[in-house]
């Protein structure tokens, strides 16, 4: 995160094994044109054994959805496309009216527009989740009778939120490769800063007790602070989650659970040392962290900011510190994992060099689940705002190969984010189900919590109105 004046900037075949499994379902009619979709057929409620049905067989925009006996009609034949849509009649999409994100919103069909309110994630656990709202498709009131309304509701694992008949997001072996070209859907602004703050930014996120736990930086326009959101279940809940200030700033934080020592670690910048860490047994308590300790004490040349935007990750032997300098370089330090938490000292290796714009800040490093691969993303400055470039490596101590590394083909940016409220895709964190030091992400279900701002916002960097949003990978 930069403190100065610069702006911060399928076609795919149906899987044979899944087709065979779906054919075994008596009520499921497999589509005859699978090349156009990830999966097709009736969508049957697990709790009711009845199908998702367009009321009265209507093909009009605004027709509502209900449960009804499965009978094989065209108004019960759904296609899950590679662009994240659920279509019926070929050209109508499952749609959330008016981009609503409130539990209890009744869903409808509408002419396909590509909007985020028509994007759905069909998960392997049977849930169907609205990308824009983060809410689950469900039979209202756990009803099972013909005519039961179908609506959005907070995901709770109930049988009325489980559906069978379409391929889930992960393939049958549970692993995916990283795409060479990324395409995302974006939420709108997920939260506004509470009174006294002009920005919410620099997010780090983990899953804790089944809920999202998000720390970030705040700006008042003249100074920086730190905060944590009260844990929440769905991204649509972020707007109403409590915003809790920390009594000691931890700017541009990294949060994770260090399993070898059974302790939570919060690393950050700007204090008595370039990088600092604190520990806790309860990461939800913003003021329950230990006294600050040095994480890194070195300095770098050719940088107006000094070391900035650290991130931490471990393999089986070592703990690694990666950081930037707003100067076209990425740096790395390491220590034996048995010595952590501790001080990396002042030594480091420069592992990447390019222009300042191409390697600016916001570096993050992750282990790719199911692959012998690590993913690095670095924030860059482009003609159309901030964006992220990606690199891959087979080891944390090795060299990094550009992957999606241009403004026209970025990891995430204006060119592929799907966001309409921001051009900038800036400092954030990939969502991890496993909060530990391996920083493992699931390439089948990538989500990216980022900061964006209105394209019309300008002026001093410290006063820019950064807000949170989430990208969801479209496969």
Curated annotation (Swiss-Prot):
Enzyme nomenclature, EC number: 3.2.1.55
Pathway given in the UniProt record: Glycan degradation; xylan degradation
Catalytic activity entry: Hydrolysis of terminal non-reducing alpha-L-arabinofuranoside residues in alpha-L-arabinosides
PROSITE patterns, A to Z: RICIN_B_LECTIN (PS50231)
Entry GO MF terms: alpha-L-arabinofuranosidase activity; carbohydrate binding
GO biological process: L-arabinose metabolic process; xylan catabolic process
Keywords tagged on the record: Carbohydrate metabolism, Glycosidase, Hydrolase, Lectin, Polysaccharide degradation, Secreted, Signal, Xylan degradation
Subcellular localization: Secreted
Family: Belongs to the glycosyl hydr olase 62 family.
Name of the molecule in the record: Extracellular exo-alpha-L-arabinofuranosidase
Organism of provenance: Streptomyces coelicolor (strain ATCC BAA-471 / A3(2) / M145)
Lineage, broadest ranks: Bacteria, Bacillati, Actinomycetota, Actinomycetes, Kitasatosporales
Gene that this sequence comes from: abfB
């Amino acid at each position: 995160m930069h403190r100065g004046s610069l702006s911060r900037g399928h076609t795919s075949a149906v899987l044979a094994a899944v087709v065979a499994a779906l054919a075994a379902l008596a009520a499921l009619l497999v589509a005859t044109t699978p090349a156009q979709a990830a999966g097709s057929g009736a969508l049957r409620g697990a709790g009711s054994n009845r199908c998702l049905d367009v009321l009265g067989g209507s093909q009009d925009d605004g027709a509502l959805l209900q449960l009804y006996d499965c009978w094989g009609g065209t108004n019960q034949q759904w296609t899950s496309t590679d662009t994240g849509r659920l279509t019926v009649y070929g050209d109508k999409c499952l749609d959330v009216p008016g981009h609503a994100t409130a539990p209890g919103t009744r869903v409808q069909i509408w002419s396909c527009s590509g909007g985020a309110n028509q994007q759905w994630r069909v998960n392997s656990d049977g849930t169907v989740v609205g990308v824009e709202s983060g809410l689950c498709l469900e039979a209202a009131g756990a009803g099972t009778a013909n005519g039961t309304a179908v609506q959005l509701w907070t995901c709770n694992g109930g049988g009325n939120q489980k559906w069978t008949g379409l391929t889930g997001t992960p393939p049958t072996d549970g692993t995916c490769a990283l795409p060479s070209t990324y395409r995302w859907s974006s939420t709108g602004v997920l939260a506004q800063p509470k009174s006294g703050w002009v920005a919410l930014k620099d997010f780090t996120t983990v899953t804790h007790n089944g809920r999202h736990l998000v720390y970030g930086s705040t700006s008042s326009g003249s100074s920086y602070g730190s905060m944590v959101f009260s844990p929440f279940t769905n991204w649509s809940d972020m707007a109403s989650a409590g915003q809790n200030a920390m009594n000691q700033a931890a700017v541009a934080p990294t949060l994770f659970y260090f399993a070898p020592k059974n302790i939570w670690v919060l690393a950050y910048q700007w204090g008595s040392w370039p990088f600092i860490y604190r520990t806790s047994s309860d990461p939800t308590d913003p003021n329950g962290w230990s006294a600050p300790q040095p994480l890194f004490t070195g300095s770098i040349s050719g940088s107006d900011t000094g070391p900035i935007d650290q991130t931490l990750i471990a393999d089986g032997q070592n703990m690694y510190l990666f950081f930037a300098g707003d100067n076209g370089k990425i740096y790395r330090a390491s220590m034996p994992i048995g010595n952590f938490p501790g001080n990396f000292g002042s030594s480091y290796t420069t592992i990447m060099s390019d222009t300042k714009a191409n390697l600016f800040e916001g570096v993050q490093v992750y282990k790719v689940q199911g692959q012998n691969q690590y993913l690095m993303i670095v924030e860059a400055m482009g003609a159309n705002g901030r964006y992220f470039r990606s690199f891959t490596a087979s080891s944390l101590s090795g060299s990094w190969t550009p992957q999606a590394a241009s403004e026209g083909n970025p990891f995430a940016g204006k060119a592929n984010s799907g966001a309409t409220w921001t051009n900038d895709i800036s400092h954030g964190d990939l969502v991890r189900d496993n909060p530990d030091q391996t920083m493992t992400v699931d390439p089948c279900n990538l989500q990216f919590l980022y900061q964006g701002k209105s394209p019309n916002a300008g002026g001093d960097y410290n006063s820019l109105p950064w807000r949170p949003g989430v990208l969801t990978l479209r496969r």
